[in-house]
């Protein structure tokens, strides 16, 4: 108070002016340092989940050529957002994720990402920083997916793989997840295209509700030799960042924020994540 001559809480307009002149990149660096300072001392072997979220309220604003899209890095085990990077076009998510990974200290962590970010260059960036990756494989790599699918769908091959099934009940449905893992990857035609590829896995999920039954397959590649339990755990951790995005939408109403200034939108996103991090840390 003495240094700045401020003796009461600034009004809405002053806060808006301050948020406008703060550089989001600088604010994000401070945010990351703060998060690392509040992390438990013995936090190791962590999973960092990457995903993007579009701030939908910016979609119809004249100052935006396309809606603001923000990529977040979430420490899954702690439920803490570690960092973020923005782009004004969702089609630029891949290079934005790669830029974010280069800026972060990810040594010793497992990086999980959706199929969009299952990219050879992204895998190389992760491995160079002495981290591991777990990528979901879908139709954006059709040949890779087909080779993995053909191998895993073969019952004879399934018998040579590690497998485990787990059933959970909740939210009005029964969910059975069966995981398959092989650390023998020499048979895969595309093995040398992916840095340190060491594991191939799949999860078959069966759902049962009052409306009937359904099922789906998910395929994965990883630079780390995983057990089936580790595959199930890491694959589920990928959804932690989606939970954070849900909180931003539902409880913080981010998609309804009509502020047009780009810096303010980006800085408000960081402040909301500060609040979520504090709630996660101090639930009591």
Go through each PLM region and give its residues.
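Gly/serine-rich nucleotide phosphate-binding loop at the start of the catalytic core
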Residues: 1
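Active-site- or DNA-interface-adjacent structural scaffold in DNA-acting proteins
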Residues: 4-61
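A residue-level signal for conserved active-site and pocket-lining positions in enzyme catalytic cores
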Residues: 11, 51, 79, 133, ...
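Generic secondary-structure signature for well-ordered alpha-helical cores
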Residues: 24, 36, 102, 131, ...
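Short coil/turn segments at secondary-structure boundaries
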Residues: 31-33, 45-47, 161-165, 245-251
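Polybasic low-complexity intrinsically disordered regions
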Residues: 38-112, 118-131, 138
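An anionic, glycine-rich sequence signature occurring as long contiguous blocks
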Residues: 138-236
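Basic, amphipathic alpha-helical segments enriched in Lys/Arg and hydrophobic/aromatic residues
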Residues: 234-284
């Amino acid at each position: 108070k003495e240094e700045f001559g401020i003796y009461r809480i600034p009004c809405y307009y002053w806060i808006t002016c301050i948020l406008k002149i703060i550089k989001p990149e600088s604010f994000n660096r401070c945010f990351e340092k703060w998060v690392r300072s509040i992390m438990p001392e013995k936090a190791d072997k962590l999973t960092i989940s990457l995903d993007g979220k579009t701030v939908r309220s910016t979609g119809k604003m004249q100052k935006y050529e396309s809606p603001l899209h923000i990529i977040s890095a979430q420490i899954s085990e702690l439920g803490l957002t570690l960092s973020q990077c923005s782009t004004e076009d969702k089609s630029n998510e891949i290079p934005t994720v790669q830029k974010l990974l280069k800026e972060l200290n990810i040594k010793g962590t497992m990086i999980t990402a959706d199929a969009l970010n299952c990219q050879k260059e992204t895998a190389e960036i992760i491995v160079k920083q002495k981290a591991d990756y777990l990528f979901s494989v879908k139709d954006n790599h059709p040949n890779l997916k087909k080779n993995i699918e053909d191998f895993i769908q073969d019952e004879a091959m399934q018998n040579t793989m590690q497998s485990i099934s787990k059933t959970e009940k909740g939210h009005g449905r029964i969910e059975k997840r069966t995981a398959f893992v092989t650390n023998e990857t020499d048979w895969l035609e595309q093995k040398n295209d992916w840095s340190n590829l060491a594991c191939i896995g799949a999860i078959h999920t069966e759902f049962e509700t009052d409306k009937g039954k359904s099922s789906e397959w998910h395929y994965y590649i990883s630079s780390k030799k995983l057990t089936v339990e580790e595959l199930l755990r890491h694959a589920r951790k990928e959804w932690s960042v989606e939970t954070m995005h849900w909180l931003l939408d539902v409880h913080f109403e981010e998609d309804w924020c009509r502020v047009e200034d780009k810096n303010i939108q980006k800085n408000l996103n960081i402040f909301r994540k500060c609040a979520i991090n504090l709630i996660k840390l101090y639930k009591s």
